[in-house]
């Protein structure tokens, strides 16, 4: 039987505050949006940051780019689910079924710890991701190891101010084109969940392009490999995501990057 090649899953999560937990722990009252803003205000007064500890967050979107083991683009989409629990369950089931290589930007510090915390809330099994016994030195939880989970934030230095948008701007990649992370809370309470999914998809496309560039400068991709992967992404976006506002930006950026690579 032919051995199945490992997929690569470049992923990102978006979250808002868990107002139910905030009410229970902090005794705040009011509508969800007001409770969220008040909690952020209190957190800022205590720590000079509005970002609450991870247990106070809940997941509202998970999106992923899927490629083959060589980085050739297959698709980008949101992880389906009628509820937070179903969405997270589907994500961990995907990991259980395919054991993909994960790629993220700060996913070892934010996305995956958050998903595991919410799995605890809903009693969702994450056995493959949490398995540190079968291979002690090569598992999803290994630090400073890119074989099972390449966290580009970690790989590129993990320094203060290392933001995906800034790195993309420096590296001639699209970056954030419309929505920024601090707008997600307001968009959610304006019933703009699809806009959040679109933003999350654009983030994973940026991460995918940054990952390709990283693999290229490491010597793992030739110029032709790199250009081909970008071309496949552009073709997919134009055929399957024509209604997304980010398509023209990513296609143009991809075309320009291909020119730079092949004209060297």
State where each predicted segment sits.
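DEDD superfamily 3′-5′ metal-dependent exonuclease/proofreading module
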Residues: 1-264
């Amino acid at each position: 039987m032919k051995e199945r090649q490992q997929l690569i899953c470049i992923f990102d999560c978006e979250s808002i505050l868990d107002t139910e937990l905030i009410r229970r722990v902090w005794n705040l009252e009011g509508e969800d949006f007001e409770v969220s803003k008040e909690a952020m205000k209190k957190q800022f007064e205590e720590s000079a940051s509005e970002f609450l500890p991870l247990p106070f967050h809940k997941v509202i979107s998970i999106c992923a780019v899927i490629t083959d083991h060589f980085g050739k683009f297959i698709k980008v989409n949101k992880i389906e689910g009628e509820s937070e629990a179903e969405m997270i369950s589907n994500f961990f089931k995907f990991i259980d079924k395919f054991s993909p290589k994960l790629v993220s930007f700060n996913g070892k510090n934010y996305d995956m710890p958050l998903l595991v915390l919410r799995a605890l809330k809903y009693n969702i099994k994450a056995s493959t991701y949490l398995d540190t016994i079968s291979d002690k030195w090569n598992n999803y939880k290994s630090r400073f190891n890119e074989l099972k989970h390449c966290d580009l934030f970690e790989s590129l230095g993990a320094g203060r101010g290392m933001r995906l948008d800034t790195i993309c701007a420096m590296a001639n990649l699209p970056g954030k084109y419309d929505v920024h992370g601090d707008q997600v809370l307001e968009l959610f309470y304006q019933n703009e969940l699809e806009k959040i999914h679109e933003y999350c998809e654009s983030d994973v496309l940026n991460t995918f392009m940054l990952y390709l560039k990283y693999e290229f400068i490491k010597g793992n991709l030739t110029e032709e490999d790199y250009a081909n992967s970008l071309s496949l992404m552009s073709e997919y976006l134009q055929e399957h995501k024509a209604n997304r506002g980010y398509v023209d930006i990513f296609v143009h950026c991809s075309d320009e990057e291909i020119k730079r690579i092949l004209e060297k």
